[in-house]
Amino acid sequence: MDLITTTAELASVCARLANYPVVTVDTEFLRETTYYPLLCVVQMASPDEAVVVDALAEGIDLKPFFDLMSNERVLKVFHAARQDIEIVWHQAGIIPHPIFDTQVAAMVLGYGDSIAYDALVERVNGHRPDKTHRFTDWSRRPLTKDQLEYAVADVTHLRDVFAALDADLKKRGRGDWVSEEMEVLTSPKTYDFHPERAWERLKTRVRKPKDLAVMMEVAAWREQEAQSRNIPRSRVLKDDAVGDIAIHAPATPERLATLRSLPKGFEKSQWGADIVAAVQRGLARDPRELPKIEKPRNNTNGAATVELLKVLLRMTSERHAVASKVIATVDDLERIAADDAADVGALRGWRRELFGEAALALKHGQLALAIEKGRVVRVERS
């Protein structure tokens, strides 16, 4: 195992790795106090070598690494790739491609919902890796021997995991299922956090166009502020405060001061003035230009349908040995219960064939569920 600290060393190792069809990759980073993750360490391995790159080494240029990430001839294997890809996207403006995410593959093969890396390694080769340094401060220097051994183990074990999952996918004919998921993971839309769409990630739900307009403006302001200062969104304004502001629409500092979700005196700060301005912009928006607010889907009949769909989903998951989470979410089920043409993953591609068609049949009485010998079974109805 080599520790790479110079651009020349990195260029040399990336040139060697580019000759292999598959390279395993992992990153270590910090983001507790920043909006954008701080890349600290990069680990890579081929069948013949493994390296750790000090991404914070003085003078190092990571361009050779980024070039390898965009090399179409090399498959990059990650576990839970989203945050690793986000880092590369932010620092270099590229999306690693092609990629293979072992966590997604494991879900497709029935290893459970979002299985952790150490648990997956243990399932594959019987050895549970040491995760002592999982929460270490990777920005501190020098890196210790234990840290380096921990870091390199992540990509060496990943070689075995990939080989096992890839073989199983081919045996069961599910390679295309994983490829479909990789298209989502490698789409720039997944990582392009435009401030005007920040409201979509909030769990707060509003029912009035006015509330939605205010929430959109306040969430966009918060996103811009967090990005420009490189601090977490919650350091600017917590999610519950955004929802509170959306509902009460405080268009003056005095009204803002009445909200309990904000600290005392907040209305006198520059951020307080910015929020009041955002509220005023929201109130001035034309309701006809706003996204359509979804009607609540929690009526009695709809709720009963969702519960039946949950049973069908569990049956499908067990029958085909696929994690239920990768087939459909609860939100998918609620949308299907409300609309046959819902734009959800469960009604597209392999998911529709595996589950979606049966879900619609169950909803319309063409399929029933019954209990036989203590087990729930599907009953086709004419």
Curated annotation (Swiss-Prot):
Domain called HRDC: residue spans: 208-289
Ranges in coiled-coil conformation: none
Reactions performed catalytically: Exonucleolytic cleavage that removes extra residues from the 3'-terminus of tRNA to produce 5'-mononucleotides
Localization of this protein: Cytoplasm
Source species, domain of life: Bacteria
This protein's record includes keyword Cell inner membrane: no
GO MF annotations in UniProt: 3'-5' exonuclease activity; nucleic acid binding; nucleotide binding; ribonuclease D activity
GO CC field: cytoplasm
Enzyme Commission numbers on file: 3.1.13.5
Major site of localization recorded for this protein: cytoplasm
Domain 3'-5' exonuclease: 4-169
Gene Ontology annotations of biological process type: tRNA 3'-end processing
Broad EC category: hydrolase
Cofactor(s) needed for function: a divalent metal cation
Keywords carried by this UniProt record: Cytoplasm, Exonuclease, Hydrolase, Nuclease, tRNA processing
Family: Belongs to the RNase D family.
Primary role: Exonuclease involved in the 3' processing of various precursor tRNAs. Initiates hydrolysis at the 3'-terminus of an RNA molecule and releases 5'-mononucleotides.
Protein's name according to its UniProt entry: Ribonuclease D
Source species of the chain: Nitrobacter hamburgensis (strain DSM 10229 / NCIMB 13809 / X14)
Gene name tied to this protein: rnd
